[in-house]
Amino acid sequence: MLKYLIFLAILISVVHSNGYMTIRLKSAFPLNVTVEVAEEVYFPTNKRSFNLQLKPNRVGFVSNIPVKFGRPGLVLVDCSPVEKFQIHRVTLRSIRWNTHVRSVASDNIFLPFTGFRYDIKCNRYWHGLHCDHFCNDDFARTINRRCTQNGTLGCLEGFHGPNCELPVPADSCKCQNGGKCVSSLENTWAQNGSLICECRLGHFEGKHCEKKSFNYFPKIEATTYATKDSHLARQFYNNSRVPNELATLPRL
C-alpha cells in the first residue's frame, strides 16, 4: 500500500497543459518593440502583448509567457521606426508553433533585427509533447527512479527490472537515430515495466525511433512598411536578410 501511495503521489496524468515560452530579440539599432502572443492562427484568441526596449547589440527577452500546448499559436513582433532608412515599421510573424519543436530560431533573420528566437519549456515536473503528464523528478530520484520523456516512471538509465537492479541488454530495444532504451512503467501500480525507445523529441518517433518526425518548424515572415518610393528603404529591404545571431544559443 505504501508503494502504491508513493507512486500515486509522483505520477499523475491530467488533461491540462502546463508550460511557458521565452522570446529573445536582438538588434543593431535602439528599438521599441511590441511582442504579441496568441492562441490559434486564423482567429487568434487569448492575446498577450508585451513591450520591450532593445539596446543596440544587446539581447532583450520576454519570459514566462503561458502557452496552451497541442494547439497552433502565433507570435507577432512589431518594431518602432528606423528613421535612418525611412522605415516606418517592421513586423516579424511566426505561425503555428508547436511543442514538437521546443526551440525556434531560423538560420537567417530580417533587419533591423539581428537575432530572434523563442523557446518553449514544460513547467517543472510536467512532461510529454504537450506538457500534460505530471511526474515529480525530484521525488522519483529519492526512490531510485526517473521520469521518462513521456512523463511515465521508470528505472534510472541503463537499468530495468522489479527493483531496477538489472542492466539493460545492449540489443534490447534496437533503437535507431540516437534513441535510448529505457524502462517505463505503464501505470502507477505496475511492478515490472517494459523497455521502450526514448526518441529525440521533435526529431524522430516510432517504436524504434525509425521515423522522422513531421517538420513542425514554423516559417518566419517579415513585412517592412516604409516611405513610398524611398531609395534608402529599397536598399534596406534588399539587404535586410542577415544571419540570425541567436540561432545557436543554448535554451534558457
Swiss-Prot record:
<dbReference type="GO" id="GO:0005576">
    <property type="term" value="C:extracellular region"/>
</dbReference>
<feature type="disulfide bond">
    <location>
        <begin position="175"/>
        <end position="197"/>
    </location>
</feature>
<dbReference type="GO" id="GO:0005886">
    <property type="term" value="C:plasma membrane"/>
</dbReference>
<dbReference type="InterPro" id="IPR039178">
    <property type="entry name" value="Lag2"/>
</dbReference>
<feature type="domain" description="DSL">
    <location>
        <begin position="120"/>
        <end position="164"/>
    </location>
</feature>
<feature type="disulfide bond">
    <location>
        <begin position="135"/>
        <end position="147"/>
    </location>
</feature>
<keyword id="KW-0964">Secreted</keyword>
<keyword id="KW-0914">Notch signaling pathway</keyword>
<dbReference type="GO" id="GO:0007219">
    <property type="term" value="P:Notch signaling pathway"/>
</dbReference>
<feature type="disulfide bond">
    <location>
        <begin position="173"/>
        <end position="181"/>
    </location>
</feature>
<keyword id="KW-0217">Developmental protein</keyword>
<dbReference type="GO" id="GO:0001708">
    <property type="term" value="P:cell fate specification"/>
</dbReference>
<keyword id="KW-0677">Repeat</keyword>
<keyword id="KW-0245">EGF-like domain</keyword>
<dbReference type="GO" id="GO:0005112">
    <property type="term" value="F:Notch binding"/>
</dbReference>
<dbReference type="InterPro" id="IPR001774">
    <property type="entry name" value="DSL"/>
</dbReference>
<feature type="disulfide bond">
    <location>
        <begin position="122"/>
        <end position="131"/>
    </location>
</feature>
<keyword id="KW-0732">Signal</keyword>
<keyword id="KW-1015">Disulfide bond</keyword>
<feature type="disulfide bond">
    <location>
        <begin position="155"/>
        <end position="164"/>
    </location>
</feature>
<protein>
    <recommendedName>
        <fullName>Delta-like protein dsl-1</fullName>
    </recommendedName>
</protein>
<feature type="domain" description="EGF-like">
    <location>
        <begin position="169"/>
        <end position="210"/>
    </location>
</feature>
<feature type="signal peptide">
    <location>
        <begin position="1"/>
        <end position="17"/>
    </location>
</feature>
<comment type="function">
    <text>Probable secreted Notch ligand involved in the mediation of Notch signaling. Involved in the lin-12/Notch pathway-mediated signaling of cell fate in vulval precursor cells (VPCs), acting redundantly with lag-2, apx-1 and osm-11. May also be involved in glp-1/Notch signaling.</text>
</comment>
<dbReference type="InterPro" id="IPR000742">
    <property type="entry name" value="EGF-like_dom"/>
</dbReference>
<dbReference type="Pfam" id="PF01414">
    <property type="entry name" value="DSL"/>
</dbReference>
<comment type="subunit">
    <text>May interact with lin-12/Notch receptor.</text>
</comment>
<feature type="disulfide bond">
    <location>
        <begin position="199"/>
        <end position="209"/>
    </location>
</feature>
